[in-house]
Amino acid sequence: MSIWVLDNAAGTFTHTEFGPYAGWTARTLTVKKDETANIAWTNVDGRVSVWNYELDSAGYSQITYGAFSGWTAQGITDSADGSACVLWDNVNGSASLWGLDNGTGAYTHHEFGPYAGWTAMAVSAGP
């Protein structure tokens, strides 16, 4: 994966490359007002990792969650405050929505279901 940053004043690009990382796939990238970005990754073993990337310094911190038996991350997005939200789906028909604190690794969650025959598919957060 590569992140390209445009400097409008200078008309130049800088870029940083990541990976490849065996078993990991970059899922989403969200750029926030404070010139940081959240990059969400999923692993084939069920883990989820959220990277907080500093666009001006190419530095980053990351927090990894899971894997959790029976649960699969179905969607990852950023909320209006810049924190990540993860939608998990369970083989029993339950869904869980996590709000992550990117700085501490703490999370809050709400679980729904189980709902027989239904699968959670995507998550989106508004302003």
Regions found by a protein language model. Name each.
Residues 1-127:
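Trp/Gly-enriched beta-strand/coil motifs that build multi-repeat beta-propeller-like domains
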